[in-house]
Amino acid sequence: MAKFNMNGKKLLPSGVWCLICVVVLFGYLGFVMGVPNMLNTIMKTAHDLLLNTVFYLMSICVITGALGRVFVEFGLVALLQRALRPLMGPIFNLPGVTSLGAVMTFLSDNPAIISLANDKRFASYFKKYQFISLTNFGTAFGMGLLVIVFMASQGFYVAPLIGLLGACIGCVCSTRLMQRFVLKAYPEYAVEDAVSPEEIAEEEEEEDENHKKTVFIRLLNSMLDGGRSGVEVGLSIIPGVLIISTCVMIFTFGPAEDGTYSGIAYQGVELLPWLANKIDFVFEWLFGFHDPHLVAFPITALGAVGASLSLIPGFIAHGWIDGNAIAVFTAIGMCWSGFLSTHTAMLDSLGYRDLTPKAITAHFIGGLVAAVAAHWMFFLFTLVA
């Protein structure tokens, strides 16, 4: 917005503020890294994210979309709704079918929940405010299996399980907080269904027609239709992943080991870790961290949990890590699981882009709650073990 003086006249046009922000941002990066290195790093990071992250996420979306459509077609979703409604309702304020989304994201990654959400029959169980909170719910379990298995491979077995419990607590906090934010902004979403009756009727007609076909044809059609929807989701997340992840990583990672910049992917100015080190006493009090370097894990997990896991062997080699840190890393790594790089794209694909700031705020708080819960649960475990 433009600034106004006492007479109501503009002091500076709106475009000037945009220009100042751009000049300051890229001027800072160019001064630290060198302009050619900065440009090369941005382009190469985005290119590597496209090839090794986006297409990986797209493959997850295709597979989980196919599985989800098969589960819907053959009645597993309806069965889960009846069986788990008493559990999911009081804890998460979500229908029982949501548990399928937790399983999908736990076995794969965050966008798997969107492949399910795009199925009208799955979405028909939700009110709008519940449907929107699916992004937060699914993200809290993203890449959970990978995180736990990786931690176990480093020789820690109990701590990751405590971290899993912490992630569940963070998920409850994030999901319910997001629902509260949505209802405060849009009270009418409390009664509006996520899917219109007309869309449900169309799906039921298609379902009746499908039931007349052989089991093999129904299986084939559901897999192909679900996979096709996964491709659409994978394409829709490209802008969010490339733009947000590149920004987060260039402010998180540092130069090469010799302190120089060469313009390769995943180099940066380490601004976020530098800021975090200024308040490392807060992280020690909240999470039980005894070394400021450990702050790099949660900061990196904001953009990509896979990248944060790569820090663990180095932490172990330097003797910075203990069971408490592993429990906290598991909780915050699962709960956040790179949500800054996927939340925008996921909400955009659901059609609620304007609610992205609320979702990010709720999930950021949920991740902190998960980490604090894991820290204190591990502390209690050490007292009784």
Describe the function of each predicted region.
Residues 17-30, 61-68, 146, 164-180, ...:
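Hydrophobic core segments of alpha-helical transmembrane domains in multi-pass membrane transport
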Residues 1-11, 46, 75-84, 101-118, ...:
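Hydrophobic alpha-helical transmembrane segments
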Residues 35, 43, 64, 69-81, ...:
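Transmembrane helical segments that form the transport core of multi-pass membrane transport proteins
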Residues 2-6, 10-72:
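N-terminal signal-anchor module of multipass membrane proteins
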Residues 112-177, 305-385:
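C-terminal transmembrane helix pair
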Residues 67-99, 118-123, 283:
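Membrane-embedded helical hairpins/re-entrant loop segments and their flanking transmembrane helices
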Residues 4-19, 226-242, 355-363:
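Alpha-helical transmembrane segments and their helix-start/interface "positive-inside/aromatic belt" motifs
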Residues 1-13, 181-228:
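Intrinsically disordered, low-complexity non-transmembrane regions of multi-pass membrane transporters
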